[in-house]
Amino acid sequence: MVELNLNHIYKKYPNSSHYSVEDFDLDIKNKEFIVFVGPSGCGKSTTLRMVAGLEDITKGELKIDGEVVNDKAPKDRDIAMVFQNYALYPHMSVYDNMAFGLKLRHYSKEAIDKRVKEAAQILGLTEFLERKPADLSGGQRQRVAMGRAIVRDAKVFLMDEPLSNLDAKLRVSMRAEIAKIHRRIGATTIYVTHDQTEAMTLADRIVIMSSTKNEDGSGTIGRVEQVGTPQELYNRPANKFVAGFIGSPAMNFFDVTIKDGHLVSKDGLTIAVTEGQLKMLESKGFKNKNLIFGIRPEDISSSLLVQETYPDATVDAEVVVSELLGSETMLYLKLGQTEFAARVDARDFHEPGEKVSLTFNVAKGHFFDAETEAAIR
């Protein structure tokens, strides 16, 4: 059983006036697949490196299986890492690359052979064991890098953007490979990415991080915005940042006020809210106050039947760009000065400049405080 506890971890670099990572607090369960996701500079890789022992922890405690390991060397933490750049030895065969770490730890020849061949079978590399890295595709090289970690049989696997060097098609297949490998070996895993699709498809839980400029503007501070399952983050974002980061295309946002049971914006949006939403917002003190209304592209419909059923939730907007994606069409539209997106039926393709009527499924909308950007519930 392997659990990790990151107890209020802080990181400040020498000669810096601010923390690069601030109050990172997380408990990771045995065999859990955790993904750190966020924009560049949010501290996700720095946090991973602190777990690995490659960066010192300025403040806070890191525990592995209940033992504080802040001062333990990386080699003594029983952690295996997979990096973005593969880090393979070009003059060695696949077999020798995978066996190298075990040889350094003085494993017997028989034990090395058994572990390498087992890992190769899991990763589909058996027929490539005698080849050199130059003779492999990008995806095969990444599997070798993963194999080198798997043979270690480490307590914890750390993966730092392992798919970012691969093309889009290969990333999709490798995501499936990583998920399959995790199910098979069941190791506690921390995975870092800037790609929210990777996070949503791989994670048991996601840690969303943000970066904000420090007061003197000399750097950024990385903070945790929300931790939860992919479904929790998608359906119940804690704030506007999380709502806008998770989902592709991103959630649409409108600056609105509530007037006579309707959401009203300066750009011409006027749609009725549900009775339950109205009561909730008024009970929270948002009657006649500015707030932010968020709605996902898939919750906006161009169906005539829906428009006839919900006329008080329908608006007219101008098409800016229309993308036919085969099974669906993405409409990028403008309402006054506000741009937004709608995911509609493939047949609803429109030329730029056309006016279209769209119905908002307000019941699936989200509300955020205009000042704090925190979710209103």
Curated annotation (Swiss-Prot):
One of its GO terms (biological process) is carbohydrate transport. GO terms for molecular function: ABC-type transporter activity; ATP binding; ATP hydrolysis activity. ATP binds at residues 38-45. InterPro entries: AAA+_ATPase, ABC_transporter-like_ATP-bd, ABC_transporter-like_CS, ABC_transpr_MalK-like, ABC_transpr_MalK/UgpC-like, Mo/tungstate-bd_C_term_dom, NA-bd_OB-fold, OB_MalK-like. The keyword ATP-binding applies. SMART domains: AAA. It is a peripheral membrane protein. One of its GO terms (cellular component) is ATP-binding cassette (ABC) transporter complex, substrate-binding subunit-containing. Involved in a binding protein-dependent transport system responsible for the uptake of melibiose, raffinose and isomaltotriose. Probably responsible for energy coupling to the transport system. PANTHER family: MALTODEXTRIN IMPORT ATP-BINDING PROTEIN MSMX (PTHR43875), OSMOPROTECTIVE COMPOUNDS UPTAKE ATP-BINDING PROTEIN GGTA (PTHR43875:SF1). This is Multiple sugar-binding transport ATP-binding protein MsmK.
